[in-house]
Amino acid sequence: CNNFIDNVKHVLGDRKLDYLIINHMEPDHAACIGLVEALYPEVKIIGNKKTFELMTKFGFEINENSIEVKDGDSISFGEHEFTFLLAPMVHWPETMASLDKTTGILYSADAFGTFGALNGRLFNDEVDFEREYLLPARRYYTNIVGKYGPQVQNLLKKAHGHDIKWIAPLHGPVWRGNLDYFIDKYDKWSLYEPEEQGVLIVYGSMYGNTELAAEDLARRLTE
């Protein structure tokens, strides 16, 4: 939490923190809530009904300034206006995405995330994503939200009607271009459609005969 608080203080300077939007309550992201509340007791916490249920179960205080949002609600913060898209089970029940309509940045929580360190890089156009991160991204999807394809489809449909310029997930690079490439991957994965047409031949061979048969089958399939 120390690095997070240092970053917040660096950005704010002597100003107070007015709002804290909670997109996801998993402790790798939300463990610092109590410290934020202690340092900024007047902060208004924004979340959905499930967010506050989990906050209570995790032992965090819910102050009277808390703001509960529902799917599609918008809040204006002056220069910035946020719209909230609830995304239950992508991949926790309280998960939601927050769209800054002023900048077009979608803060997508765990959706569109990727395994792997970025090694000082931040944006998708700073890496060779297909070579370096597509496999970890596919593995991330499979492990984190792969079971919940219909829920991912719901989020994609909600986001489709908005002018999204950037996607900022909680893991992996921030997407500031070529968004359709990764959205198409998520669409295919969540529909359980293959990215490429092919046949997987799985076999076990104690004496090598089944292996020969499998190789012969593979050759015939390529013809």
Model-found features: residue ranges?
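N-terminal beta1-alpha1-beta2 submodule of the flavodoxin-like/Rossmannoid cofactor-binding fold
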Residues: 179-223
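Active-site neighborhood of phospho(di)ester-bond hydrolases with catalytic His/Asp-centered motifs
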Residues: 17-25, 45-48, 106-109, 167-171
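Metallo-beta-lactamase
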Residues: 46-169, 175-176
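Short, surface-exposed basic-aromatic patches at helix termini and helix-loop junctions that form
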Residues: 10, 35-42, 60-61
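Di-metal (Zn2+ and/or Mg2+/Mn2+) metal-binding site signature of metallo-dependent hydrolases
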Residues: 4, 16-37
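Conserved beta-strand hairpin/beta-sheet module of binuclear metal-dependent hydrolase folds
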Residues: 1-10, 97-100, 104-108, 199, ...
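Pre-active-site segment of Zn-dependent metallo-hydrolases
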Residues: 1-20, 43
